[in-house]
């Protein structure tokens, strides 16, 4: 029996352009053009990710190869974070990883 290994990296959960599960999406019904753009991007990226994972299932092992969360956002002065609390970033990354429904998960 073949076993599928999938490697993902650079989720950057917590960054405006990072992978964002639905629980943390921006509301697209806003007057702010930047937020509307980000709301659309979040949905498109999540749709791409979930379709790719669904196409790859069943996944035996998932390797998460770094940068699951954005962290403090020091380079941008935290201006590009959609969630600055790292515990929320961790929850976001956990949802992304759990979506794969892999039998084994290794985070490097």
Model-based region annotation:
Residues 1-92:
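N-terminal active-site segment of His-dependent metallophosphoesterases
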Residues 59, 91-108:
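Eukaryote-skewed repeat-based solenoidal scaffolds used as protein-protein interaction platforms
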């Amino acid at each position: 029996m073949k076993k599928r290994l999938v490697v993902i990296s650079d989720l950057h959960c917590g960054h405006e352009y990072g992978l964002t599960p639905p629980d943390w999406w921006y509301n697209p019904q806003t007057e702010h053009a930047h937020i509307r753009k980000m709301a659309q991007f979040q949905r498109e990226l999540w749709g791409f990710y979930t379709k790719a994972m669904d196409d790859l299932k069943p996944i035996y092992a998932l390797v998460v190869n770094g940068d699951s969360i954005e962290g403090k956002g020091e380079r941008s002065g935290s201006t590009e974070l959609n969630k600055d609390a790292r515990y929320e970033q961790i929850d976001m990354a956990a949802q992304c990883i759990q979506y794969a429904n892999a039998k084994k998960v290794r985070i490097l």
